[in-house]
């Protein structure tokens, strides 16, 4: 019985405990004129950043920051600017140190991203625009690319 409890205690596990919006800003500097102009295909500048912060021995805050600027196709008129930092507290226990970076950079943001995407979409609709739909993000590919770049830099 004690052996079973020891195996359970050492079992790696993580879960999202709380999700929240840390920062949210939406601006439409060209309103109301932008709604009267004939619509054209907008130009989107998007920056997505992942941040991780250890809260205590068992908890990590993982946040996704989105900075988006949407302009008319000629770039002369800003339709809207969206800034969002959406975060979650993850309970992380018994994850081997060599796997922790991957859990925080891949698994956690993969769980968080659909909710972050929904907030961004809803805010743009509430601002009078079409839904701002971001493509799904392959966090594993980003993690592997960062690791490869890190290895190349240490080799030089």
UniProtKB/Swiss-Prot annotation:
GO BP: any one term: protein transport
Localization in the cell: Cytoplasm
Keywords: Chaperone, Cytoplasm, Protein transport, Translocation, Transport
Superkingdom of the source species: Bacteria
Matching InterPro entries: SecB, SecB-like_sf
Pfam family, one: SecB
Gene Ontology MF term list: unfolded protein binding
GO annotations of cellular component type: cytoplasm
Sequence similarity: Belongs to the SecB family.
Subunit structure: Homotetramer, a dimer of dimers. One homotetramer interacts with 1 SecA dimer.
Name of protein: Protein-export protein SecB
Originating species: Desulfotalea psychrophila (strain LSv54 / DSM 12343)
